[in-house]
Each structure stands twice: as structure tokens, then as C-alpha cells.
Amino acid sequence: MALKRIHKELNDLARDPPAQCSAGPVGDDMFHWQATIMGPNDSPYQGGVFFLTIHFPTDYPFKPPKVAFTTRIYHPNINSNGSICLDILRSQWSPALTISKVLLSICSLLCDPNPDDPLVPEIARIYKTDREKYNRIAREWTQKYAM
């Protein structure tokens, strides 16, 4: 079941790739993918290329995939291990969601962080109190790690 669904998503991605994103299996292992997200233009991540790993559980799509950044990023909802705080990867997961939709949600999280549900409270505090400083540091990290 999982493998069939993963193959279908791979075909859908090839036919209709989401804007600014790409994803596909690493080698022959269909349960382990690598994804790429281009830093959105209207964000301090503009110009960056961010890599993520995707691990599908054997009971996919009934359980969410594990998605994590491998490129370092300065963001209140993404910690230094690359873990992403995003409701659809946890409690709000639904089998109707696809990797394409997950990647688009991560893209929109880059444009619009959620400082009220942070993984990194210190970055959330800076985002809320000094947006200029947040944008500057996020741009610096993007230049340092994602270009």
C-alpha cells in the first residue's frame, strides 16, 4: 500500500512539480527521499537552496512522513537538528495530504513563521520584537549555509 502510494506521488511530482520545490528517492530506496526548496523571493531566505530529507513510514499515508532540513536555517519553527514544527507533520496529518502539499506548506512557513508555536523560542522572540534583526540574521545564515 505505502509503496504504491509513494510511486503515485513521485509520478505526480514529475508531472506537476510544486513551485520552488523538488523531491525524489535517494538511490533505490523509495522510502527515503531528498527534497529541495528554493528560498521564497519574499523572504530573507531568497536565493538559498535548502535540502531536506523525507522518510516515509511503512504505514504511509496513514502516518505522516518524517521531514527534516539538512541545510541549516535560521527560523523559529526549525531547530538546529532540522526538525520542523508544522501541525500537518504531527497532529493535523491526513492521508489526503501529499509530499507536494507538505513541501508547499514548508515554503509558506518560510514566508510566514509561526512565532506562537516555536521550536526555537529565542528566534521567535527576536522575530516578534526586532523583525529587522531577524531578517538580517536569516539572510546571513542563508548566504552562509544555503548558497
Swiss-Prot record:
Disulfide-bond pairs as recorded: none
Q: Could you tell me which pathway this protein works in?
A: Protein modification; protein ubiquitination
Q: Which Pfam families match?
A: UQ_con (PF00179)
- Do you know which PROSITE patterns this protein is assigned to? UBC_1 (PS00183), UBC_2 (PS50127)
Q: Which GO terms describe its biological process?
A: protein autoubiquitination; protein K48-linked ubiquitination; protein modification process; protein polyubiquitination; protein ubiquitination; ubiquitin-dependent protein catabolic process
Q: Which reaction does it catalyse?
A: S-ubiquitinyl-[E1 ubiquitin-activating enzyme]-L-cysteine + [E2 ubiquitin-conjugating enzyme]-L-cysteine = [E1 ubiquitin-activating enzyme]-L-cysteine + S-ubiquitinyl-[E2 ubiquitin-conjugating enzyme]-L-cysteine; S-ubiquitinyl-[E1 ubiquitin-activating enzyme]-L-cysteine + [acceptor protein]-L-lysine = [E1 ubiquitin-activating enzyme]-L-cysteine + N(6)-monoubiquitinyl-[acceptor protein]-L-lysine
User: Impact of changing residue 63 to A/E on the protein?
Assistant: Strongly reduced interaction with CNTO4
Identify the keywords attached in UniProt to this record, alphabetized: ATP-binding, Nucleotide-binding, Transferase, Ubl conjugation pathway
Q: Which InterPro entries match?
A: UBQ-conjugat_E2_core, UBQ-conjugating_AS, UBQ-conjugating_enzyme/RWD
Database matches in Gene3D superfamilies: Ubiquitin Conjugating Enzyme
Which residues are in the UBC core domain? 1-147
| EC number(s) given by UniProt | 2.3.2.23, 2.3.2.24
Q: Name one GO cellular component term.
A: cytosol
Please tell me which top-level EC class this enzyme sits in: transferase
Q: Known SUPFAM superfamilies for this protein?
A: UBC-like (SSF54495)
What would you give as a GO molecular function for this chain, any one?
Answer: ATP binding
Q: Which family does it belong to?
A: Belongs to the ubiquitin-conjugating enzyme family.
Q: How does it assemble?
A: Interacts with SCF (SKP1-CUL1-F-box protein) E3 ubiquitin ligase complex. Interacts with CNOT4 (via RING domain). Interacts with E3 ubiquitin-protein ligases CBLC, PJA1 and PJA2. Interacts with PDZRN3. Interacts with PPP1R11. Interacts with E3 ubiquitin-protein ligase PHF7; the interaction inhibits cleavage of PHF7 and promotes association of the complex with the nucleosome core particle.
Q: What does this protein do?
A: Accepts ubiquitin from the E1 complex and catalyzes its covalent attachment to other proteins. Catalyzes 'Lys-48'-linked polyubiquitination. Mediates the selective degradation of short-lived and abnormal proteins. Functions in the E6/E6-AP-induced ubiquitination of p53/TP53. Mediates ubiquitination of PEX5 and SQSTM1 and autoubiquitination of STUB1 and TRAF6.
Provide the protein name: Ubiquitin-conjugating enzyme E2 D2
The encoding gene is UBE2D2
